[in-house]
Curated annotation (Swiss-Prot):
UniProt-annotated binding residues for L-citrulline: 88, 93, 124, 128, 179, 188, 264, 276
Pfam families, alphabetized: Arginosuc_syn_C, Arginosuc_synth
GO BP terms, alphabetized: argininosuccinate metabolic process; L-arginine biosynthetic process; urea cycle
Source species of the chain: Ectopseudomonas mendocina (strain ymp) (Pseudomonas mendocina)
Protein family according to the UniProt entry: Belongs to the argininosuccinate synthase family. Type 1 subfamily.
InterPro entries from the UniProt entry: Arginosuc_syn_C (IPR048268), Arginosuc_syn_N (IPR048267), Arginosuc_synth (IPR001518), Arginosuc_synth_CS (IPR018223), Arginosuc_synth_type_1_subfam (IPR023434), AS_cat/multimer_dom_body (IPR024074), Rossmann-like_a/b/a_fold (IPR014729)
A molecular function GO annotation: ATP binding
Residues given in the record as ATP binding sites: 10-18, 37, 118
EC number: 6.3.4.5
Subunit: Homotetramer.
This protein's pathway: Amino-acid biosynthesis; L-arginine biosynthesis; L-arginine from L-ornithine and carbamoyl phosphate: step 2/3
Protein name: Argininosuccinate synthase
Location of this chain's protein in the cell: Cytoplasm
Amino acid sequence: MADVKKVVLAYSGGLDTSVILKWLQDTYNCEVVTFTADLGQGEEVEPARAKAQALGVKEIYIDDLREEFVRDFVYPMFRANTIYEGEYLLGTSIARPLIAKRLIEIANETGADAISHGATGKGNDQVRFELGAYALKPGVKVIAPWREWDLLSREKLMDYAEKHAIPIERHGKKKSPYSMDANLLHISYEGGVLEDTWTEHEEDMWRWTKSPEAAPDTPTYIELTYQAGDIVAIDGKAMTPAQVLAELNRIGGENGIGRLDIVENRYVGMKSRGCYETPGGTIMLKAHRAIESITLDREVAHLKDELMPKYASLIYNGFWWSPERLMLQQMIDASQANVNGVVRLKLYKGNVIVTGRKSDDSLFDANIATFEEDGGAYNQQDAAGFIKLNALRMRIAAGKGRKLI
């Protein structure tokens, strides 16, 4: 890629991407534009500006994407009750298509002919970033330094930084032993002692949540208001999508909700252990299923459940911008037209317990479902014909002597 003149770098301001910035300048003799996304990771993003300026960067983008992230990515995903391999709420996966989108937008705005990222050659993120980039700008060049250079250890990165006067602190506050990624939906932990699947995670690793043992001894009740499948208010107070998720993170974290320790199957072929804190997302998943339980038609609900694992895999594997994901999203969104109402939850020591749900669009009819006298709302004699018709094929097979036991 000797013809690269300008590169947009997804830049955090940390060691890896600061080294990448200088490496791009030296290796490709190109201009670098930095892009730093505020996705609600809870850290200051402005220091990235000073670091980029110190390395001679002239065009610096620092964007607050919190509302767009939750509104256009997290909320649509939760309309599908999305969960990967039965446990993972896709906190890292769902952030990558937005970052890829913004990288391409900035490349178009600045006339850059390439983008670059700090994802390693072992992980899923390289796939997610690049699939998104190619979908949105087919001819874009992608530079992935971890697949090119020989700086394959933290010590080598530190040595490179010192040699090139990159402003990175070698000493100071103790560095976390984990590789972490955070946004408004979750925080993840990988590496360190977690690479031994038998070793228990350390209590002081967790940053967002209290342990269930340390959570309050009295439950917290909340009410979530839904419109078209999305939460629009907490306890009657209207909030934006990002405000909703931030508040649910706070409440859930206080009550020890949302911790997860799993081994997942990466798209690149290996198994990887990760620990996650997703307090708000854990509450959202439980509540959304509760409001759907009274507002969705049975067959629509079952079809959504059948398609959800495919939808989850598309997001996990980086196919957010694919035609099949977009097609599924249209179906999912259409199913949410009547998913309106209020869900009441009890939060207690790591548990999310549904205690009530109500909706003007509810399909629950107490007159039909009652165990008491229903006044003829449901004719129980109709069940006999229903059962016989459903048994017909099995009765025919049995009549032909087919043995079942």
